[in-house]
Amino acid sequence: MDAIWQGLSGIFEVVLIAGLGFFLAKKGWFWENAAKDLTRLTMTVALPPLMIHSLYANFTHDALIAAAPDLMLPFVSIFASYLAGHVLASLLHISKGRRGIFICTCCIANAIFIGVPVNVALFGEASVPSCMLYYLANTTMFWALGAYLIIRDAGGQHRFTLKEMLLKLRTPPLMGFAAGVILLLANVPIPHFAMAAMKYVGGMATPMALMVIGIQMSQIPLSSIHFDKDLVGAMAGRFLLAPLCLFLLLPVIPVSEMSSKVFLMQAGMPAMTNMTILATAVGADAEYSTTVNCVSLVLGVFFVPFYMYMLS
């Protein structure tokens, strides 16, 4: 019961902060590109120092090495949900122009911008290393498998080279995480004032990210949403199929208690925003992708309590 209440308390925090962003957006407090600007501030300024501070605050050299094997589970579970997404797309007769986006939704989550703040709110900063392990697997699988499917939706056949994939993985949060890992493994001490500064700057990440979610939710045009089989199936894949694949693999690929909680939460996060960006860039069905992103964002608020109940 205590675990459920702890989870619900974290959920209330998430909903209240996102609700504040929603309320202020409806009142006209934000400028036109506020969501984009705050997202950039969160990704490039707040999250990198949060990565380093969290590693130093919650891990030692030996503990970090012991956590590395946990990386296998997210790779296997994402690939399993990728295969399951293919099966579901065939069963529902998803049109070829949407099939890549549909499958991508089933297996790829918004593991960094939404995943990290939600997990930090629920489990504290100790969850950040596990979040980053899932994020590494999630981003790698998106550019290795998902991106090709979306490009194929638009009639293209481009496959990303290893060099292109590595460049796509070079994001500020992952670079911050990599820097923290290298410094910690090298036993490099960080001065107290630097740790304090990183704590304060990194502390902006969760409230800013959640307020951006509220802003984005306030901009969703309800008239453009049609709950057909393509949308309902994608939501089932995102919030039921992906977490189920990971849940079933937990007894097969054992991980730490924290990683098991975080990975399950990460697997059930809303759809990845890069999916819509790529769909727009290559000429795939961007409208469908945008709708999937928006609806998954709203439904994510309601599915988090369900995942917490499963964990308890």
PLM region spans:
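Alpha-helical transmembrane segments of multi-pass small-molecule/ion transporters
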Residues: 1-312
